[in-house]
């Protein structure tokens, strides 16, 4: 081989080596980019799921608040009924006393 042929061969090998290195680097960059895109996609899926869960929880909270309001109304009505029963028991006791007094 002549010096120029040998120089061209070395230059070709050098260029080939640089190209191989650049292709490897680009391949690694593409893999890293793909992983990042997938991670971002997964993150957006998680955020979407979190948003759906929050909406479901909000509905549950609203339903619970409604149930608590209804229970408060029922409690108030039960208190009125308890007071009425207590008043009737007192009146019944008074009537019994009056009957005993009349029957003596």
UniProtKB/Swiss-Prot annotation:
Pfam families: BORCS7. InterPro entries: BORCS7. It is found in: Lysosome membrane. Keywords: Lysosome, Membrane. It comes from the Eukaryota. One of its GO terms (cellular component) is lysosomal membrane. Disulfide bonds: none annotated. Belongs to the BORCS7 family. As part of a BORC-like complex may play a role in lysosomes movement and localization at the cell periphery. Associated with the cytosolic face of lysosomes, this complex may couple lysosomes to microtubule plus-end-directed kinesin motor. This is BLOC-1-related complex subunit 7. It comes from Xenopus tropicalis (Western clawed frog). The gene is borcs7.
